[in-house]
A protein has these predicted regions:
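Positively charged n-region of N-terminal signal peptides that target proteins for export
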Residues: 1-4
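Surface-exposed, charged secondary-structure patches
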Residues: 22, 62-63, 71-120
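A mature extracytoplasmic/lumenal domain signature
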Residues: 53-55, 63, 117-119, 128-130, ...
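Residue-level detector of flexible, active-site-proximal loop/helix-junction positions
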Residues: 11, 64, 142
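Bacterial N-terminal signal peptides
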Residues: 6-16
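Short beta-strand edge/turn micro-motifs at domain boundaries
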Residues: 112, 122-147
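Short, low-complexity N-terminal intrinsically disordered segments enriched in polar/charged residues
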Residues: 18-47, 51, 55, 149-154
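N-terminal, post-signal-peptide region of Sec/Tat-exported proteins
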Residues: 42-82
Length: 155
C-alpha cells in the first residue's frame, strides 16, 4: 500500500511539473511574439512584424479631436506591416527603444500581454493559432509628455 501511495505521489508530482513547464513554454512563446512585434517595429523588419501578427489583427487607439469628439483610430495587420517596412521605429534612438514585455494572463488558447515601449504602451491580445502564438488585437496609448521644469525668470 505504501509503495502504491508513493507511486501515485510521483506520478501526480510529475504531471504537475509537466503542466507548469508547458505554461512556462507558452509564456516564453507569447513573450517572443511580443518581442517580434516591438523589435520588428524598431528595426523596420516587416517580415518579423508579420510573423507576430494574425492576418485579421486590429490595432486601435482612442483619440479625442480638438472639439472633444472621441474617435477610434484603427490599423490592420497589413497596414502595420507596410508601415513597419517603410520606416518603422528606425528614427527612435537605440537608447530610447524600450521594450518591456509582461505576460499578464494565459488561459487555454488566449493570452494578454503588455509592452512598455519608447513613447507608448501596447496592450496585446494573443491567440494560439495553428500552434503559434500570434497577436490578434492591440490597444495602445501614448505616454504622457514629460513635464518640463518651469523656467525661472531673471531680473
Amino acid at each position: 500500500m505504501r509503495k502504491l501511495l508513493m507511486l501515485l505521489f510521483v506520478v501526480l508530482f510529475a504531471s504537475v511539473v509537466h503542466v507548469h513547464a508547458q505554461a512556462k513554454s507558452d509564456a516564453d512563446l507569447i513573450r517572443q511574439a511580443a518581442l517580434d512585434y516591438i523589435e520588428g517595429w524598431y528595426e523596420a523588419d516587416g517580415a518579423r512584424m508579420e510573423r507576430a501578427l494574425h492576418p485579421d489583427l486590429a490595432k486601435r487607439i482612442v483619440r479625442v479631436d480638438p472639439r472633444g469628439r472621441y474617435m477610434l483610430g484603427q490599423m490592420s495587420a497589413m497596414g502595420l506591416v507596410q508601415l513597419t517596412r517603410e520606416e518603422g521605429g528606425k528614427n527612435i534612438p537605440k537608447e530610447k527603444q524600450q521594450k518591456d514585455v509582461t505576460v499578464l494572463d494565459i488561459f487555454g488558447n488566449a493570452a494578454t500581454a503588455k509592452i512598455i515601449a519608447a513613447d507608448w504602451i501596447d496592450y496585446l491580445h494573443l491567440a494560439k493559432w495553428k500552434g503559434r502564438w500570434v497577436i490578434v488585437n492591440v490597444l495602445w496609448e501614448n505616454k504622457p509628455a514629460p513635464q518640463q521644469a518651469p523656467r525661472s525668470s531673471s531680473n
